[in-house]
Amino acid sequence: MEWAKWTPHEASNQTQASTLLGLLLGDHTEGRNDTNSTRALKVPDGTSAAWYILTIIGIYAVIFVFRLASNILRKNDKSLEDVYYSNLTSELKMTGLQGKVAKCSTLSISNRAVLQPCQAHLGAKGGSSGPQTATPETP
């Protein structure tokens, strides 16, 4: 940086002051044209990196908030299994097989994907359109 010497006895004090002001502000401004008098402030690289990081964090925060709201709203809905088994029960009521379903419902099913023999027997007789397994029937 060039320092301008202040000499109060000279007649060009205003010129030296404007030169000094130009040197002080010259480091912080750019884009100075003769036709356009607007000046843009330089943004240090650290500031632009901080805005970049904050933007990424903000995007992830918005995604997190929407997923959290979705999970909260989903807890009020019935699960897919509840809907499937309630529809199955209503279909069995219409066909008159409710007595056999009540007998099989006392079994505790640990894995719902595997049908118990009683359920496979009901599915074969009732003409159910659900998945059928090849489990042997026990007497």
From Swiss-Prot:
What membrane topology was assigned to this protein in its record? Single-pass membrane protein
Descriptive protein name: Small integral membrane protein 34
Q: Mind listing the UniProt keywords for this protein, alphabetically?
A: Membrane, Transmembrane, Transmembrane helix
Q: In which broad location class does this protein mainly occur, judging by the first location in its UniProt entry?
A: membrane
- What Gene Ontology cellular component terms go with this record? membrane
The organism of origin for this protein:
Homo sapiens
Q: Which residues cross the membrane?
A: 46-66
Q: Where in the cell is it found?
A: Membrane
